[in-house]
Amino acid sequence: MSAVFRKEFRSGLTSMTGAIFMAFVLILNGLFVAYYNFISASPHFEYAVIAASFLSLLAVPVLTMRSFAEERHSKTDQLLYSLPLTATQIVLGKFFAMIAIFAIPTAVVCVYPIISEAYGGGEVNLATAYGVLLAYYLLGCAVIALCMFLSTLTESQVIAAVLSLGVILVVYFLKSFSSMVPTSEIASLAVVLVLALACGFIIYAATKSYIAGGVSGLVLVIAAVVVYVVKSSLYEGLIGKILSAVSIFSAIESFANGVFDITCIIYYLSLAALFIVFTVQSFEKRRWC
């Protein structure tokens, strides 16, 4: 795994995509810190980080698009399969390399609270500032894991980047859509059924097994219908709750109140782990295709 990590980390640092990614993250965070903490003379560093989180992470597809799509396109993925490593070790090596690259601009941003306190709008709460930076970094790790999984679904870097960017945009605006959706029980059931089928498709895409995808989707559909029959009141307003829950960019907003939200930390770690598992399954399935 260390060999994969060193190769990917070195490649990320020496390639144009890695440089563009790190520069974009630093520039976006720098602009928001300059506006919030210097121009507006606000001591709340966490506001700048939260405001910059979405825009700065739009660059993640640039970093992840080549992780697996390029390997498939150039047929070098066969070399990965020949290594004396498991699929999990290969995926983790690539993932750790990408989050290590993301850690570089994040480490630079960690200096900003000290600069803001010295030359900005007042005394900065360093505990809150570094708490939100931890959440920001873990949010980035979760987004990297998501985009890495999407990269395994295609052999085109461009398609991988566009697909990842589209998913990030959809996820970001989910919370805004939550207030616009119907709250009736039957509408919620319909959405849950669609999500159940979508989960079945995702499992199929990751495993390339019609049985795994079909059975999973069918089980979820049956479970949703049974719950509706037994206690339909659970479905009232469920669509909005689901949209708010999967909007990963809104979870970090709790840090704006100076609260270290441990549930947010666990949420991001769980998301990263989930998409790493999906990536491993998708990568392992192609070994036998």
Predicted regions located by residue number:
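Hydrophobic alpha-helical transmembrane segments
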Residues: 1-70, 129-134, 161-162, 190, 201-208, 216, 228-238, ...
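Short amphipathic alpha-helical coupling elements at transmembrane boundaries
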Residues: 3, 7-11, 78-82, 152, ...
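Secretory targeting signals
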Residues: 29-36, 40-48, 52-55, 96-166, ...
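Transmembrane helix segments
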Residues: 35, 157-253
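Helix-loop-helix units of permease transmembrane domains in multi-pass membrane transporters
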Residues: 67-97
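Short aromatic-rich membrane-water interface segments that cap or initiate transmembrane helices
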Residues: 126-135, 250-263
